[in-house]
């Protein structure tokens, strides 16, 4: 069954985990962090580790918890990082993350035409 038949998706949202580039932050850490904030698990549908591994963290058919007002019509992708070693905002994406992000977005755009 195609996920695109289950809910109307028109938006793909990219987030960072807002974690330091010199620290590891696994998909399990992300899940714990979101549960401590009162969510029922990770709010993003996909998580991209520094090594480029794409982790499915929430079924696409399940509405996300990542961008208020747009959760019902969007897919959330989060990449590990986003802060430098001092805790300041920085594009910390590795080449592996950039590649995986491109592949994932292209796949989602194919499955959900009309997404922006």
Predicted segments, located by residue:
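Active-site-adjacent loop/helix surface patches within enzyme catalytic domains
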Residues: 1-115
């Amino acid at each position: 069954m195609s996920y695109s038949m289950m809910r109307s998706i028109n938006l793909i949202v990219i987030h960072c985990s807002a974690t330091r580039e010199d620290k590891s932050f696994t998909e399990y850490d992300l899940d714990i962090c979101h549960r401590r904030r009162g969510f029922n698990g990770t709010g993003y549908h996909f998580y991209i580790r520094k090594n480029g591994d794409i982790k499915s963290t929430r079924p696409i058919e399940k509405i996300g918890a990542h961008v208020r007002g747009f959760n019902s019509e969007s897919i959330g992708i989060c990449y590990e990082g986003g802060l430098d070693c001092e805790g300041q905002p920085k594009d910390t994406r590795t080449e592996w993350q950039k590649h995986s992000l491109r592949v994932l977005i292209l796949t989602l755009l194919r499955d959900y035409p009309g997404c922006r």
